[in-house]
Design a protein with these regions (language model features):
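Non-catalytic extracellular/periplasmic "stalk"
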Residues: 1-129, 133
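Catalytic cores of peptidoglycan-degrading enzymes
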Residues: 108, 117-254
Length: 254
């Protein structure tokens, strides 16, 4: 028959050994809770920063991730006091805390994977000059006001033009107005376009990573001089590339 705790004489070697074991278990529990808390805090801070950065592009996380991959943000801090001497309640609290931290870390991993496929880089990594922005401008050929659904960057002739996120090449050839142009599908509704290239260095169907070379800067098509015309398209609609490039500076610095 197992001996009850109440039957063990106070001050006996057995009682001392049990007390030491309980103290060790309590200390271990406290250390685990502290580690979980630190993990959750770091993940929450990084997740919060990435959400703010994505918001600066004009999009929210709910636009980009399925609901199943977004942690329940209602899960906040607080709750009843649970005495660690009651290990049954303490164990329950530990598993609840671990589950909450796990949800947040899973969401962070999903967001960081998503970031790899959002065009947040610049199409030129060499020294360049911004020459024309997104929106209404005076057309350089006709002098009339017209929409410009991209950004223009000038640089040295044949400078490498690079992919602004991982993706798959869906077009590599000539288009009216664009000259030699490359289009990349990044998934999640994002497509980027690189126009007026001197030379194309990728083929349709090719997978590319961020900053992989897709062509060389040139002046083909409707162009007044060497530059790359760069577009960001989300679900078929043009977006201002500047917002994505500026957001990317914070992502890659982080």
């Amino acid at each position: 028959m197992a001996q009850k705790r109440s039957d063990i004489p106070t001050g006996s070697p057995t009682a001392a050994a049990l007390e030491k074991m309980e103290t060790s278990a309590t200390n271990l529990y406290v250390q685990q809770m502290l580690l979980l808390g630190a993990l959750e805090e770091r993940a929450n801070r990084r997740l919060r920063d990435l959400k703010l950065i994505l918001a600066s592009t004009g999009l929210s996380l709910r636009d980009l991730l399925p609901p199943a991959k977004i942690a329940n943000t209602v899960l906040a801090e607080g709750g009843p006091f649970i005495d660690v001497s009651n290990m049954s309640d303490a164990s329950s609290a530990f598993f609840q805390h671990a589950n909450r931290a796990g949800l947040i870390v899973d969401e962070l991993n999903a967001v960081e994977d998503l970031i790899l496929h959002i065009p947040l880089s610049s199409p030129l990594t060499v020294s360049r000059r911004f020459t024309s922005g997104f929106g209404v401008r005076r057309d350089p050929f006709t002098g009339r006001m017209a929409n410009h659904f991209g950004m223009d960057f000038s640089a040295a002739w044949a400078s490498p033009v690079t992919a602004t996120a991982a993706g798959r090449v869906i077009y590599a050839g000539q288009r009216t107005g664009y000259g030699n142009v490359v289009e990349i599908d990044h998934g999640n509704g994002f497509v980027t376009r690189y126009g007026h290239l001197h030379r194309i260095t990728v083929r349709i169907g090719q997978r590319v990573d961020i900053e992989d070379k897709v062509g060389e800067l040139g002046s083909t098509g409707r162009s007044t001089g060497p530059h790359v015309h760069y577009e960001v398209i989300y679900k078929g609609k043009p977006k201002n590339p500047r917002r994505f490039i500026e957001a990317g500076r914070y992502v890659f610095e982080g």
